[in-house]
């Protein structure tokens, strides 16, 4: 992504590269199965990615946005919003597919950017100002992170002039903290509200989800 978009969002002025890794939609968010059919779940996952990207494209400090995914629908949606897209080369059965995908994307953008953030793609209540404030706070540290609303996961991992060293997965908040990353303490409720379960989705809806997610849920 580069330059100014027609909707007024700013695409190329920043010095930070953002990475979002997205798994195959059919395999994503299986814990939402109690409330959505498989087809609707895929639509909701894609909508949450759309709302996350829409918020991110309005953050002036982001100079590029890259989505790495093996999923054609997710890739098309990301490209339609102006993101760069990488095909995820992670093989089936890889023991750590998410972190491998993030590391792959990091290598791809590191030639142009030394400041990188890995962001979850399931943040339908994300506000652009929240992400902008988190990026600004992260500049005070070489490596930092924002925990999710339950303080067990990681919503965003930042690296300024150093490697991301991503440790997403179970108890990633503790793993990032123990690896030396500084925990950022801003409120940022939408940034912290990733959606894995029906309870998470209810929390996001209370905050106010983006237009794409609202439409996907309404169609259910």
From Swiss-Prot:
Residues where phosphoenolpyruvate binds: 154, 169, 172
Record flagged with keyword Nucleotide-binding: yes
EC number(s) recorded for this UniProt protein: 2.7.7.105
Keyword S-adenosyl-L-methionine in annotation: no
Pfam families, per database record: CofC (PF01983)
Reaction(s) catalysed by this chain's protein: phosphoenolpyruvate + GTP + H(+) = enolpyruvoyl-2-diphospho-5'-guanosine + diphosphate
One biological process term in Gene Ontology: F420-0 metabolic process
Pathway membership, UniProt: Cofactor biosynthesis; coenzyme F420 biosynthesis
Signal peptide range in chain numbering: none
Keywords: GTP-binding, Nucleotide-binding, Nucleotidyltransferase, Transferase
InterPro entries registered for this protein in UniProt: CofC, Nucleotide-diphossugar_trans
Gene Ontology MF terms in the entry: GTP binding; phospholactate guanylyltransferase activity
Broadest EC class assigned to this enzyme: transferase
Disulfide bonds: none
Purpose: Guanylyltransferase that catalyzes the activation of phosphoenolpyruvate (PEP) as enolpyruvoyl-2-diphospho-5'-guanosine, via the condensation of PEP with GTP. It is involved in the biosynthesis of coenzyme F420, a hydride carrier cofactor.
Family statement: Belongs to the CofC family.
Alphabetical list of NCBIfam families matching this protein: F420_cofC (TIGR03552)
Protein name: Phosphoenolpyruvate guanylyltransferase
Source species: Mycolicibacterium paratuberculosis (strain ATCC BAA-968 / K-10)
């Amino acid at each position: 992504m580069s330059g100014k978009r027609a909707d007024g969002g700013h695409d190329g002025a920043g010095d930070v590269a953002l990475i979002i890794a997205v798994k195959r939609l059919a395999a994503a968010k299986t814990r939402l199965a109690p409330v959505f059919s498989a087809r609707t779940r895929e639509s909701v996952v894609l909508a949450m990615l759309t709302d996350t990207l829409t918020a991110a494209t309005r953050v002036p400090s982001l100079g590029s946005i890259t989505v790495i995914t093996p999923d054609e629908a997710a890739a098309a949606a990301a490209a339609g919003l102006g993101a760069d897209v990488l095909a995820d080369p992670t093989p089936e059965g890889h023991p750590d597919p998410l972190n491998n995908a993030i590391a792959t994307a990091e290598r791809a953008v590191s030639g142009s950017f030394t400041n990188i953030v890995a962001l979850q793609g399931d943040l339908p209540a994300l506000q652009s100002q929240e992400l902008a404030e988190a990026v600004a706070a992260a500049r005070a540290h070489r490596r930092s992170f924002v925990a999710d609303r339950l303080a067990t996961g990681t919503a965003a991992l930042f690296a300024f002039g150093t490697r991301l060293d991503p440790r997403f997965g179970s108890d990633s908040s503790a793993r990032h903290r123990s690896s030396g990353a500084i925990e950022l303490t801003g409120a940022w409720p939408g940034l912290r509200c990733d959606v894995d379960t029906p309870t998470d989705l209810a929390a996001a809806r209370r905050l106010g989800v983006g237009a794409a997610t609202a439409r996907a849920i309404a169609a259910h």
